[in-house]
Amino acid sequence: MRSWKVIFPGSLYSKLKDFLFSSSPKENGCFLMANHYKAGPTKSVLIVTKVILPTHNSWQHAGESSLVPTSEFINKAVIEADVTGLCPIFVHTHPSSHHPPSFSSVDQSTNFRLFQNLNEILSTRPLGSIVISRRGITGVVFSDGRLEEILQVTAAGLELKNVQVPQMNDTSSRLNSKFDRQVRIYGEEIQRLIQRMTVSIVGLGGTGSSVAVQLTRIGVGKLILIDKDSIEETNLTRVYGSRLTDVGKTKVEVIKKHLRSFSRSTKVEALQKDVTKDDVLDKLLQSDVIFGCTDNLSSRAILNDVSIQYYIPLIDTGCRIHKLPNGKIDQIVAKIQVVTPDTACLWCTDSLDGVAILQETLPEEERRKLELEGYRESTDKQPSIISLTSIAASLGVNKLLQMITDSTTDSRTEIELSIPIFISDRPKIKQGCICQKRRGIAGLRKVT
């Protein structure tokens, strides 16, 4: 049987809760519209893109212990779902409860009638019902003729909230004593959240390998490592865990072996694949967060699309060292940018260049010709050093920790070491950017 995850844009979830509890002590509710996708053989995801608010005549009954929608309100949701191809989710509150929520007998009767009515027209898509109290959230999905549990609810914004679902909060699970120092900082529940996370890292060079080591040491539950390349001699100065005897071996396997040498608690999956050519989308969709650690613009554009279409936060990390013609270094930069449903994407901040991406796809001979003619800057063998790639990796990992502890407001951080200067800001979503059309559309557009 499948389990389900529901992802809200962080800002939408915050506004939704404010609205739902505004009628307290009476129950309140609405319909949500969501796209859905599979995130592995036994897990599916609903991503909320729209809210249908009630009017004064949307309830057959609204009291402190029950809430029943009218047939008209249900029909309104059916029509919206039928026209848009989205999945309807009925959500309501138990505002007076100070316990983790569960469906009452009235709720169960409402769910039965709701699913029966919706299924007559929307039989090929999942149908959901959620109840929220001040102590958490629970829900079910009716799909393929059976009820399945919602086991995870995430509000994906700069604050990456994992909303409490009763089945997920196993407070009896014992934490390994090796995490004592960080538990003293963040507390036991945050450590348990870290240990439940699945994180993909695309690009396992100096930055990506450092990210992998740091995430493993803080106890992330599973890492998915993706890189097509093998260790070269010049990688030995930057790639964590690499040795002289590793030259010629795949980066992902070398780093996986290194991670296993100091931790057995983090599961590691190593994929020697090219994110621009190989089908790795199904693996990326299993992630709670994606780290982009590649300087290839084509792969960064793909990860940007995955993030905005599927509501999976992306932490894009990078370094840049620029030298003048006379050999003097005039720029040493480590930077990260977080892409979420609520923040600017990489196109918004001009971190991506359409012409440069097109040039990357050209045959090598044509790329070399453009470089010789001065129409393209060579991206081969760019200067790099472990001290800088490690700074970028640490910025990214610290940003993730800030996101899950609700302690960040900025989506972009940049350190210019040659001046030096530290910049932290939240760029605005650019008017007319393609991300506004692609947010939350999931598989309706192929990621290319």
Q: How would you describe each model-predicted region?
A:
Residues 115-121, 133-146, 164-170, 175, ...:
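Glycine-rich phosphate/adenylate-binding loop
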Residues 187-232:
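Glycine-rich adenosine-cofactor-binding loop
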Residues 220-263:
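Glycine-rich phosphate-binding loop and adjoining beta1-alpha1-beta2 segment
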Residues 1-89, 95-166:
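Conserved beta-strand-loop surface patch within small alpha/beta domains used
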Residues 248, 252-289, 294-301:
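A structured beta-alpha segment of the ubiquitous adenosine-cofactor-binding alpha/beta core
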Residues 113, 171-199, 231-245, 264-266:
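Short acidic, glycine/proline-enriched helix-loop-strand junctions
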Residues 124-127, 266, 310-312:
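A short helix->loop->beta-strand "cap" motif at the edges of active sites that frequently abuts
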